[in-house]
Design a protein with these regions (language model features):
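Tubulin/FtsZ superfamily GTPase core signature
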Residues: 1-234
Length: 234
């Protein structure tokens, strides 16, 4: 799967999750308007600083315009560094750089002919009013992007954000590893089916259940409340 799926991590929060995927062996391009934030990613292989950006300080409009102005170069970076069948854009919905640049970048890349999914983070209730306004606007834009593949949502209200990031990446990678690690004479899930699932438009849910048969797994998932997992997806 590592040659089929890659990630564009936008902003500081996106970078935190991107690093976990890179540690798993996936290609990740880190994009930020803040050079200082990029400098904290010491072991990152691919980093790109958007010109004229010195951070966006929760200003979504500024982040969107910076992406529009520099899209040709951003697209070239993606094409040369992490060309893959499916690319997920990772960003926080409540910040500035990620919240503004994430949906805009996803939309422009889809228009450019690429298959794009999203992974985004919603703020916890204690964060600022501005963060929640940004998150609302971010999701309003995400829902209007035609052709967007699956979208995963991490809810920071479900626990420590760094722990949630780690659990999410572990669960997501376990899902990607199903064709390699789980084989049965009763039937298998192959890589193409995993990719097709992730390409499907709409929100996605990742949860953990143990069972011996497929019917038991399906029943367990149906009985799992959405609030159970740190991932809540439409």
């Amino acid at each position: 799967m590592k040659n089929k799926i890659a990630f564009v991590a936008v902003g500081q929060a996106g970078g935190n999750i991107g690093q976990l995927f890179e540690q798993k062996g996936y290609n990740v391009l880190y994009i930020n308007t803040s050079q200082e934030d990029l400098d904290t990613l010491e072991k990152a292989k691919f980093k790109y600083h958007i010109p004229n950006g010195e951070g966006c300080n929760k200003d979504r409009r500024k982040a969107k315009q910076l992406v529009i102005d520099d899209f040709d170069q951003i697209a070239a970076e993606i094409e040369t560094k992490i060309k893959s069948e499916l690319i997920f854009v990772i960003f926080a919905s409540g910040g500035g750089t990620g919240s503004g640049a994430g949906p805009m970048l996803a939309d422009l890349l889809i228009d450019d002919g690429k298959t794009i999914g999203a992974m985004t983070i919603i703020p916890n209730p204690e964060e600022s009013v501005k963060s929640h306004m940004n998150s609302y606007e971010c999701f309003s834009e995400l829902t209007q992007i035609p052709g967007l593949a699956s979208c995963f949502i991490l809810d920071n209200n479900n626990g420590d954000k760094l722990e949630l990031n780690s659990r999410f990446v572990e669960d997501f990678c376990s899902f990607l590893d199903i064709p390699e690690k789980h084989k049965s004479v009763k039937g298998n899930i192959d890589k193409a089916e995993i990719i097709e699932t992730l390409k499907a438009h709409g929100m996605a849910v990742v949860t953990r259940q143990k069972a011996q048969e497929s019917a038991e797994v399906i029943k367990a998932i149906h009985n799992t409340p959405v609030s159970y997992t740190h991932l809540t997806l439409p």
